[in-house]
Amino acid sequence: MTGQPTTGIRATAARTDRPPNDFTGLAKVVAASGLMHRRYGYYWTKLIGAVVVLAAAVAGFVLIGDTWWQLFTAAALAILFTQIAMLGHDAAHRQIFVSGRWNDWTSLILGNLLVGMSYGWWQHKHTRHHANPNKIGSDPDIELPVVSVTPDQVDRRARRYGPVLGWVMAHQGVFFYPILLLEGLSLHASSVRRVLSREPLRHRAVEGSFLAMRIGGYLALVFIVLSPGIAAVFLAVQLGIFGVYMGLSFAPNHKGMPLVPASVKLDFLRRQVLMSRNIRGNRLLDVAMGGLNYQIEHHLFPSMPRPHLRRASGMIKDYCQAHGVHYTETGLLESYRIVTRYINRVGLGERDPFQCPLLQQRAAV
């Protein structure tokens, strides 16, 4: 089934009967297919390749020296850091190794030491998202600090900030993309804030040490090699492109998809499939998006190795259609149009911007 713009739903009374567990049958089919088996050759190639390419990039940066041509290096590093972050995402989901400890340390090295993002902060936030995607009051990914993605957020912020921001919120879909230029800086700041906070953090000493080495060492290298003016622009370009790339990779996954009221309960299959959107494309897109374009498959089987997601998508799509579960997929550019249109309509105060198939799904549960 091709993707249609779908979003906010009206709260419905929770049914007392227990929802069916259609996921069990799918899990058996996927397990029998061997798609949950680890791909060590694939991941060791990517892990070693990431370290080699990063080392080459740093060496090239030093050799090129103090010149405005380094802005191209900044762009290349932004792309490389995003790809490494996506690899860390795989490790955090136990896709790379069977050993939880190996996955944890891989995530710490890739995330904290190489990219400058706290593994513990991301894991805490992302685990809650996976448990209840797009569920109001449960999913931290729909509680954005600037952009409103639910009508209640619009009402709350309008009362707090007054009518001055009315026009901005009405056009927030357009501002969403420029705001992503600040996302890279926000990710680093959130990571540092979590490490310095009193909230529980399993590897606080390691995370703090790795973050200090990465952020401090990176800034020192940039300002040693480059003059202050070029260094400042270099950092702005690198952080800006990093934030945009990260944002454009994650935004199509759930933005503009159904919002689940806090009172509504769904079985696992529908909770993951109905709130997720796949992005059609070739293998180049698979690499560019780090496998996030198979969001439905990833949410159903988070530990499935990335190279197996494409093969699993056809199997899971057929299963969903056979069980009457709406499976959404669309093109990349169309997904951005859907996201923009939805965020704008929420900003204008529309309570139910699109016809949502979740109501029909609820009737069948």
For each of these PLM feature ranges, what is it?
Residues 1-8, 22-26, 146-153, 311-314:
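Short, compositionally biased low-complexity segments
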Residues 2-29, 175-186:
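Short, charged cytosolic
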Residues 5, 256, 338-346, 350-365:
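Conserved catalytic cores of large enzyme domains
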Residues 14-50, 54:
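Low-complexity, highly charged intrinsically disordered N-terminal segments
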Residues 40-84, 111-116, 170-185, 200-250:
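Alpha-helical bilayer-embedded segments of polytopic membrane proteins, i.e.
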Residues 76-200, 261-352:
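Membrane-embedded catalytic scaffold of the fatty acid hydroxylase/desaturase
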Residues 88, 213, 252-253, 297:
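Single, functionally critical "micro-switch" positions that shape active/binding sites
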Residues 238-251, 255-256, 316-322, 326:
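C-terminal, active-site-flanking charged/polar segments
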